[in-house]
Amino acid sequence: MLMPKRTKFRRQMRGRMKGKAKGGKEIAFGEFGLQALEPAWINSRQIEAARIALTRYIKRGGKVWVKIFPDKPVTQKPAETRMGGGKGSPEFWAAVVKPGRILFEVAGVPKETAREAMRLASHKLPIKTKFVEREEMGGDANES
């Protein structure tokens, strides 16, 4: 599973997930992508489950890029523990995802295969997503 090799501090504040994604909104490597429509924490197990669903459906044909990384430690205190006694121990790692963020990218497969693979992967995630295609840059259409 994905997690940082080392961090400066073991615990982090929860923070707020307001606004839209600042970066990672365009497809950078592949031809098709899966875009988040809601804010959420996506933990490393969910990312891995979605990645496996994608790669199993695509088989050997295409290439998959995971565009998010779980770099936020999420702490939990043990069950039935009294309040106080400090912050809990880190239990899992999460990626902070805001609306508009590209989560996965795929290349080297037909559009329908990519769409179905992304649909299967989206069922493993706790947020609503949409299938997006790369928009080609360049002004070919307006040349006279």
Curated annotation (Swiss-Prot):
Keyword Ribosomal protein: yes
CDD domains linked: Ribosomal_L16_L10e
PROSITE patterns according to UniProt: RIBOSOMAL_L16_1, RIBOSOMAL_L16_2
Disulfide bonds: none
Record bears the keyword Phosphoprotein: no
Molecular function as annotated in GO: rRNA binding; structural constituent of ribosome; tRNA binding
Signal peptide: none
Keywords for the protein's UniProt record, in alphabetical order: Ribonucleoprotein, Ribosomal protein, RNA-binding, rRNA-binding, tRNA-binding
GO biological process: translation
Coiled-coil positions: none
One of the record's GO cellular component terms: cytosolic large ribosomal subunit
SUPFAM superfamilies listed in its UniProt record: Ribosomal protein L16p/L10e
Subunit field text: Part of the 50S ribosomal subunit.
UniProt family annotation: Belongs to the universal ribosomal protein uL16 family.
Annotated function: Binds 23S rRNA and is also seen to make contacts with the A and possibly P site tRNAs.
Stated name of the protein: Large ribosomal subunit protein uL16
The species this protein was found in: Natranaerobius thermophilus (strain ATCC BAA-1301 / DSM 18059 / JW/NM-WN-LF)
Organism phylogeny: Bacteria, Bacillati, Bacillota, Clostridia, Natranaerobiales
Gene it is expressed from: rplP
